[in-house]
């Protein structure tokens, strides 16, 4: 295979991967009272319809993926339990 064709195909494949990356949406709330913190998920596999488990000030919630960065996915290795979080 011609090296120029190979390089072009490789560049196309890499750009497709980068452009198709999905993120958690920006959280709506920027603060939360401690008594209202609830985790609906602890990892992406807790969510349905290929949603992401996203960390927010009031806990972890499942959200549809966004094309724009702004939110933060939950670390699947972090200690987490679903339900209300009591301090």
From Swiss-Prot:
- GO BP annotation list: defense response to bacterium
**Can you summarize the PTM annotation of this record?**
Contains 5 disulfide bonds.
Return one GO MF term: toxin activity
- Signal peptide (UniProt feature, chain positions): 1-20
Give the UniProt subcellular location, in the record's own words: Secreted
Identify the keywords attached in UniProt to this record, alphabetized.
Antibiotic, Antimicrobial, Disulfide bond, Secreted, Signal, Toxin
Where does tissue-level expression of this protein occur? Expressed by the venom gland.
Q: List the disulfide bonds.
A: 24-54, 32-58, 41-53, 42-80, 47-62
Q: Which InterPro entries does the entry mention?
A: Elafin-like_sf
Q: Which GO terms describe its cellular component?
A: extracellular region
Per UniProt, residues of the WAP domain are: 21-66
Belongs to which family?
Belongs to the venom protein 11 family. 01 (wap-1) subfamily.
So what does this one do?
Has antibacterial activity.
What name is this protein filed under? U14-lycotoxin-Ls1a
């Amino acid at each position: 295979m011609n090296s120029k064709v190979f390089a072009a195909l490789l560049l196309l494949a890499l750009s497709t991967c980068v452009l198709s990356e999905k993120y958690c949406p920006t959280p709506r709330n920027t603060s939360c009272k401690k008594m209202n913190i609830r985790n609906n998920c602890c990892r992406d596999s807790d969510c349905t319809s290929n949603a992401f488990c996203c960390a927010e000030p009031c806990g972890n919630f499942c959200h549809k993926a966004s094309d724009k960065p702004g939110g933060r996915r939950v670390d699947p290795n972090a200690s987490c339990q679903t339900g209300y979080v009591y301090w």
